[in-house]
Regions:
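Bacterial N-terminal signal peptides
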Residues: 7-16
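Contiguous, well-ordered beta-strand patches that form the walls/edges
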Residues: 63-99
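Sec/Tat signal peptide C-region and signal peptidase I cleavage site
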Residues: 17-23
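Beta-sheet ligand-binding and adhesion/scaffold domains
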Residues: 84-128
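N-terminal glycine/threonine-rich, aromatic-flanked beta-hairpin/loop signature
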Residues: 44-74
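Short, hydrophobic/aromatic-rich segments at coil-to-beta transitions
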Residues: 29-36, 52-56, 79-85, 105-107
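Positively charged n-region of N-terminal signal peptides that target proteins for export
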Residues: 1-4
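Tryptophan-anchored aromatic micro-motifs
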Residues: 24-45
């Protein structure tokens, strides 16, 4: 069964990207790899993209150090090798990344359950 096309507008790159959800997941280069996202010395995550649509993250530093959660994500090509990746965590936290695999950079916007927004950017490094 083919998933209907998604249209994802983005002001970040100044154009709209169109792709089917199935095509986006298949083209996503992170599947089968592990990355570290370094937002600051106190905010570092290991992102293990175990399979298309599933990722386990581990907090490696800061107040959430040691937290591990497996989430179901959606990856949408913005301008490959840049992808918008988003998911909802068990506590209701909503996370959106723009991951640029060509530049090794990641931007994140996080909406916490209490209504607070967190905006970070940093290095995205493949470790496996």
């Amino acid at each position: 069964m083919r998933v209907p096309s998604l249209v994802v507008p983005t002001l970040l790159f100044g154009f709209a990207a169109t792709a089917s959800a199935a095509d986006a997941q298949e083209a996503f280069p992170a599947v089968g790899h592990v990355y570290e996202a370094h937002f600051s010395a106190d905010t570092v995550f290991k992102l293990d993209f175990t399979q298309a649509g599933q990722m386990t993250y581990t907090s490696l530093a800061g107040p959430t150090r040691g937290k591990v959660e497996t989430v179901h994500y959606t990856a949408v090509p913005v301008q490959p090798p840049a992808f918008m990746v988003y998911w909802r965590e068990a506590d209701g936290t909503c996370v959106v990344h723009v991951e640029n695999f060509g530049r090794g950079h990641v931007w994140t916007n996080i909406a916490l359950p209490g209504g607070e927004f967190v905006h970070l950017d940093g290095e995205l490094k493949q470790v496996r």
